[in-house]
């Protein structure tokens, strides 16, 4: 039975956890952080081990689960919305899944020829813990000495970079408990929306492009090849959402699909792929918190703020003017027009991935811009990765300049910029 302490407590609290027990914690909103210290035993947070007697700081609104396999004692100081223990946790099932994937990696290791390790896709509706399960599986793999690739197709949260982006990252160390996986040198593409719905064709095109790059990495890196990849997906699982799941599963040649919570999706995918793909149905954790639309918006804003200022506000972004004449601004996707108005031989799908020049206006204020890695228009800007992001803080049409917030000082490394529908108001 769960024991709960539901009070915004400021005092220092100690918790003693028995083996196979989880302490679920929600830090209160506001301006006070919570500090967690492992006093004895062993414990982990989403697959990353806690270091004994080290202070870990969690920001207001943080939600985490401290799990122990053998038992432990932890101390928490700071304002908590909720803190309770539970022995009803799917962690043993998640560990069994990891061990099955590890056996696949061992088989791939033994082949002298290049043998692909597990390509795992985690799917399910919103708020079932997909990102957490992906983080667990990746952390466990890295702790075994593997080098898996983390693939993020969830444009709503954008854990590979910023919301509205898709990407992949080769992992060499477990996620930092406070800051997550190190995002040095990720492969990132701009989708530009927080849901796949505005542009299914572009979403599928970028999924396929990332899959191609991942397989190229597998060919060059035998360790990464045997380690495989773990793919996080959006929480849309019906209609177009289901179609993009199937497309991504095919593009990445997935051999394991983990379905969290929803039996209907599990059965649909079993019928779709038959015996070609192992479909695994797992329960969601009881600690998963349902997020409101407002909460999701706040998380996206915090993600963008962290990109420019750092998780602990330890980065100092640069603000400077950029002349309109020094850059070329585009957006991906032209407005839909009646089929009768399209040029001969063209379909609506081509409009969805068309590169459209953008004339700077006051509407650019607060917009997120991606810096394309392309050096000329002869390259396909739509399918070229991006190397960074800017936010437009001001637009001066008389002087033909815009003031941007940038992680790096001037000058800009490239001149081709892609417009996103994501907006960020920098009140720092």
Curated annotation (Swiss-Prot):
According to the UniProt entry, its GO molecular function terms are: ATP binding; polynucleotide 5'-hydroxyl-kinase activity
The record's subcellular location field reads: Nucleus
| UniProt cross-references to SUPFAM superfamilies, sorted A to Z | P-loop containing nucleoside triphosphate hydrolases
The main place the protein resides is nucleus
Q: Name a GO CC annotation attached to this entry.
A: nucleus
Q: Which domain of life is it from?
A: Eukaryota
Q: Where does ATP bind?
A: 22, 63, 127-132
What is the disulfide pattern of this chain? none
> Which keywords belong to this entry?
ATP-binding, mRNA processing, Nucleotide-binding, Nucleus
Q: Which HAMAP family match?
A: Clp1
> In UniProt terms, what function does this protein have?
Required for endonucleolytic cleavage during polyadenylation-dependent pre-mRNA 3'-end formation.
Q: What is this protein called?
A: Protein CLP1 homolog
